[in-house]
């Protein structure tokens, strides 16, 4: 089932946000994020989970329609948000997930990260197994920002726009563009 199908003669510009953790780790959306969303005027906002409180969605909806998924810390959304969503944007199949995928994968990931450290290849393999037909995979969870095209699939983890847990993490969000010709491009935007 597809949550949204959207085709346009113009490029569809979307913001992707993850791991806001409001109010369990920070009190509000980063003010620079708010200013950048005002300037960007995205057509859609994707939230890749760990929202923590429903007011975050309401605040983001001031800028564009929000499509969100439930993260491992989104207990308040158990009955209202799915774990995964799919979209068709300018003929590109998009899969949105938090990245923990399910209870079993969450604990496996915890152990792998503890013992082996973060590894993008591990995430990409698991995500592709859940969404083998996707052209675009959007995810969060690790707070590790990624923007790469690999084997014809565009991957983006916007990092966290609220919490930089490790020295190599910076606060960030993502911008992703879907051209009418089916070309997908994206960038990570650092927040100070």
Enumerate the language-model features and the residues they cover.
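N-terminal active-site segment of His-dependent metallophosphoesterases
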Residues: 1-64, 80-83
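Acidic, histidine-bearing metal-coordination/catalytic regions of metal-dependent phosphoesterases
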Residues: 1-16, 169, 174-192
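Short acidic-hydrophobic surface loop/beta-edge motif
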Residues: 3-7, 83-91, 146-150
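Active-site-proximal loop/helix segment associated with metal-binding centers of metalloenzymes
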Residues: 7-11, 24, 94, 99-122, ...
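Active-site neighborhood of phospho(di)ester-bond hydrolases with catalytic His/Asp-centered motifs
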Residues: 16-18, 44-50, 67-72, 96-97, ...
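Active-site environment of divalent metal-dependent phosphoester hydrolases
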Residues: 22-25, 51-56, 73-79, 102-106, ...
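Extended active-site neighborhood of metal-dependent phosphoesterases/phosphodiesterases
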Residues: 57-95
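Conserved beta-sheet core of the metallophosphoesterase superfamily
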Residues: 67, 88, 114-187
């Amino acid at each position: 089932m597809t949550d949204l199908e959207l085709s346009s003669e113009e490029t569809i510009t979307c913001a992707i946000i993850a791991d806001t953790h409001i109010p369990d780790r920070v009190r509000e959306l980063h003010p620079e994020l708010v200013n950048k969303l005002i300037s960007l005027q995205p057509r859609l906002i994707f939230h890749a989970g760990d929202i923590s409180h429903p007011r975050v969605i309401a605040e983001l909806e001031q800028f564009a329609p929000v499509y969100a998924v439930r993260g491992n810390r989104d207990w308040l959304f158990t009955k209202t948000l799915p774990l995964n969503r799919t979209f068709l944007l300018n003929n590109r199949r998009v899969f949105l997930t938090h990245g923990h995928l399910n209870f079993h994968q969450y604990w496996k990931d915890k152990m792998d990260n503890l013992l082996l450290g973060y590894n993008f290849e591990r995430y990409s393999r698991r995500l592709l197994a859940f969404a083998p037909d996707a052209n675009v995979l959007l995810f969060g969870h690790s707070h590790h920002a990624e923007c790469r095209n690999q084997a014809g699939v565009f991957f983006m983890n916007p990092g966290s726009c609220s919490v930089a847990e490790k020295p190599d993490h910076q606060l960030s969000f993502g911008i992703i563009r879907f051209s009418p010709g089916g070309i997908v491009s994206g960038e990570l935007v650092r927040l100070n």
